[in-house]
Amino acid sequence: MLDFVVIFTKGGVVLWHSNASGNSFASCINSLIRGVILEERNTEAKYYEEDHLAVQFKLDNELDLVYAAIFQKVIKLNYLDGFLADMQAAFKEKYGDIRLGDDYDFDREYRRVLSAAEEASAKQVKAPKTMRSYNESQKSKKTVASMIQDDKKPVEKRVNIQEAPPPSKSQPSSPPTGSPMDKIIMEKRRKLREKLTPTKKTSPSDSKSSKPEKAGKKPRVWDLGGNSKDAALLDRSRDSPDDVQYQNINSELVGTMQGVIRDLDVESEDEADNEDASSEGEAEEQVQSKKGKRGGLLSYFKGIVGAKTMSLADLQPALEKMRDHLISKNVASEIAAKLCDSVAASLDGKQMGTFDSIASQVKEALTESLVRILSPKRRIDIIRDALESKRNGRPYTIIFCGVNGVGKSTNLAKICFWLIENDFNVLIAACDTFRAGAVEQLRTHTRHLNALHPAAKHDGRNMVQLYEKGYGKDAAGIAMEAIKFAHDTRVDVVLVDTAGRMQDNEPLMRSLSKLIKVNNPDLVLFVGEALVGNEAVDQLVKFNQSLADYSSNENPHIIDGIVLTKFDTIDDKVGAAISMTYITGQPIVFVGTGQTYADLKAINVNAVVNSLMK
């Protein structure tokens, strides 16, 4: 039932393997190493799937070994965890720390461990189902606090109704003088006399004059409101022609964005303190107190200077602090938990140095993991790719997508300015046909960019053009026409602006998937805010899922890169960069850092990690 079992080092050297099917599983193992082990993803589950195959693996951090078993995904093998643990114990028992090159005779031990695991699994299946214990029941999971009655709850007021005792026969039946019954009788007689006494009737006019007149409801007048009478004063369409030129042009921006985008400038100061020594000491004392006192003076000195094997119990206090620290830096809670689980899996069973502390080991492992996550698997070089497309006689197309209000149009204009600075002429396709003012915003950017780079300096050719068809049209059709127009007029780059949409809006997500499928762009960039935390995970997962689900292509085009906006507003809370990159596995191409066209940077991995670890 196991197609392939292998033992290899984390460096990729195969020590021993058993191939029952005779097929090659090299690509599956390489994908496991690249996608899971090196990036420390899903190391807690110890499970990986590729096509019709599934891989169950176990890490040995003490010897830096990986034990992996490959089987068909449709088969469920419940004994694999125990089997891999027994195989690890058998391998360490036979060879220990000895390295024999490629000569590892482990076949007999493998068959023994496998047969024992299969027999134990078969017995477990045949065994009668036993009743679950009290500890496994739902009642045992109730906390003590939930069963304690709260005495501070407001006490309901109870009304006690008491029946009056019957009157005794010795008392007279008539009420005494001054009793409530006398008062009631006197009041009724007075009302009867008032009815019988004739009164002077007042005329209707007198009654009307005596009553004060009620004032009618006055209409509300808003302070900044307007009406049709103010339209003539506000109309500037006649004396302000469309070809108005900008009088105050910030010419200092021209020439500042030539070449490669500059890296993000984030303070990368050394951390003020590696970890609070007192808090670390308290955490370690708590762990030691749980383990109990043992050994006296010798064990005391061994704990100070001796090499120690780290366990999950030792790592837990430091990992909890690190998880809270990551969440405070705006990392999504789910991603922070996965990162800490990954660090725990990489350090469990590893030998500590003589004077190393657990906190320093955790911090070092987490820093390495963050650097790997932020380092791109592939480099997106827009200038190189745009020059390649220009040589092939076609425009280079970029589509911008994202939720509402994150700054898609603004950062599109920044990227457009950067491309103009590098001698590319650009066509902006206004495919946001939904939001009021979207086309006018792009038209304003187009005029401003042409004012910064006038046609007179570029052989009489406008460096930026706007292709728009108004509102309410099909965005995919407008983008197709814009790309065709760019091809006919030999425009170098087409930037497609799309409408902002929430990730749960199915009609708009179908429209975006159609736009990407029909036009087949060179690059799809997701524009997201650096302010978001948990929302970043939901946005990216659902955008990618929608682009894959609503496309009829066998290999749908999903998000290629990320533009992180409003990075200047978050100080050192840079966790959104980790969340977005971890979810998609795609690089952060641009970072928006301000309000001008020159406020566009490339991400600096080390600087971001240093800010995150402060």
UniProtKB/Swiss-Prot annotation:
It comes from the Eukaryota. SMART domains: AAA (SM00382), SRP54 (SM00962), SRP54_N (SM00963). The modification Phosphotyrosine is found at Y246. Residues 164-178 have a biased composition (Pro residues). Residues 119-244, 268-290 are annotated as: Disordered. Pfam families: SRP-alpha_N (PF04086), SRP54 (PF00448), SRP54_N (PF02881). GO terms for biological process: axonogenesis; intracellular protein transport; protein targeting to ER; regulation of protein secretion; SRP-dependent cotranslational protein targeting to membrane. GO terms for cellular component: endomembrane system; endoplasmic reticulum membrane; signal recognition particle receptor complex. In 8-9 hours embryos, expression is seen in a segmental pattern along embryonic ventral midline. Residues 268-285 have a biased composition (Acidic residues). The keyword Nucleotide-binding applies. It is found in: Endoplasmic reticulum membrane. Belongs to the GTP-binding SRP family. The NG domain, also named G domain, is a special guanosine triphosphatase (GTPase) domain, which forms a guanosine 5'-triphosphate (GTP)-dependent complex with a homologous NG domain in the signal recognition particle (SRP) complex subunit SRP54. The two NG domains undergo cooperative rearrangements upon their assembly, which culminate in the reciprocal activation of the GTPase activity of one another. GTPase induced rearrangement of SR drives SRP-mediated cotranslational protein translocation into the ER. Heterodimer of SrpRalpha and SrpRbeta. This is Signal recognition particle receptor subunit alpha homolog. The lineage of its organism: Eukaryota, Metazoa, Ecdysozoa, Arthropoda, Hexapoda.
